[in-house]
């Protein structure tokens, strides 16, 4: 009696295995043997899947190095980023932060020497701020602006300090001397957040953190803002990890991963 042919993997199973190969390579696995061990699939099947992925440009093979992610994934990544605007991706996270804090929430991107506001969720405490969606404010005097500058150097920081004035003339007296401004920016850059201590509007304080994309580049910043009575220094310090967590969640939507999750290529 002729033995029945072995059942072939279903389309869903094949897809899942193909994705497992891609994820394995993305995690730093470079040779076929290690990919097999990582995903728990026979060598012949893994080789067939990897060959198909190379042919379709989802993977590529570099001599002396092994498998790497292919150009098709780069193309799809950029397409995915363009298909869904940043503000749309960020909105659920901003709304959650607004509910938790009761304060005004901002999302901004850099536009030259200014912070351009993409989103604003007003707070529940009855105060009104000058910020508006589509408006610009100087980078060096806003919390989101400083957060957008955290990867810059000191020459850029000083250039931005002199590039714009606070939106309120009454806040002009709060402008810091160059060295004090640099000291603060150094501290902010080391810690990954920024404060607005009434630098732009009297009595308005802000806690901000940068948003990064898959390349770890700062592409936006998120902030929580309120008046001094609602935002004493103790609360500002307490808000830092909360705002950073929201910024990290938005960054994750853009493909960013924490440094500890980045694996070195296998040698």
Residues covered by each model-derived region:
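N-terminal helix-turn-helix
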Residues: 1-88, 252-256
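Short amphipathic alpha-helical signal-transduction/dimerization elements
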Residues: 26, 145, 149, 153, ...
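All-alpha effector-binding/dimerization core of bacterial HTH-type transcriptional repressors
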Residues: 81-126, 153-154, 163, 184-187
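A cytosolic small-molecule/anion-sensing beta-strand core signal
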Residues: 63, 111, 220
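Short, solvent-exposed recognition segments
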Residues: 127-200, 267
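Extended hydrophobic
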Residues: 173-247, 266-267
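Short, structured helix-loop boundary elements
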Residues: 11-15, 70, 83, 87, ...
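Short, highly charged C-terminal tails/helix-capping segments
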Residues: 256-267
């Amino acid at each position: 009696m002729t033995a029945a042919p072995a059942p072939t993997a279903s389309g869903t199973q094949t897809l899942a295995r193909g994705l497992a190969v891609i994820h394995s390579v993305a995690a730093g696995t470079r040779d076929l043997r290690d990919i097999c061990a990582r995903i728990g699939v026979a060598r012949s099947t893994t080789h067939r899947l990897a060959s198909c992925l190379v042919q379709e440009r989802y993977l590529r093979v570099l001599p002396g190095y092994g498998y790497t992610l292919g150009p098709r994934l780069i193309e799809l990544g950029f397409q995915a980023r363009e298909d869904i605007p940043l503000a749309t991706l960020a909105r659920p996270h901003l709304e959650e932060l607004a509910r938790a804090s009761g304060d005004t929430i901002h999302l901004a991107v850099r536009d030259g020497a200014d912070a351009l506001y993409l989103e604003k969720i007003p707070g529940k405490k009855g105060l009104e701020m000058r910020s508006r969606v589509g408006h610009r404010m100087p980078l060096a005097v806003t919390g989101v602006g400083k957060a957008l500058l955290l990867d810059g150097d000191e020459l850029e920081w000083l250039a931005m300090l002199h590039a714009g004035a606070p939106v309120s003339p009454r806040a002009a007296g709060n402008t810091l001397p160059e060295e004090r401004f640099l000291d603060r920016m150094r501290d902010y850059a080391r810690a990954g957040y920024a404060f607005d201590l009434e630098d732009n509007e009297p009595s308005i304080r802000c806690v901000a953190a940068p948003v990064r994309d898959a390349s770890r580049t700062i592409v936006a910043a998120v902030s929580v803002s309120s008046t001094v009575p609602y935002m004493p220094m103790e609360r500002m310090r307490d808000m830092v990890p909360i705002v950073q967590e929201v910024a990290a969640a938005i960054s994750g939507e853009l493909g960013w991963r924490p440094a500890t999750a980045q694996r070195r290529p296998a040698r």
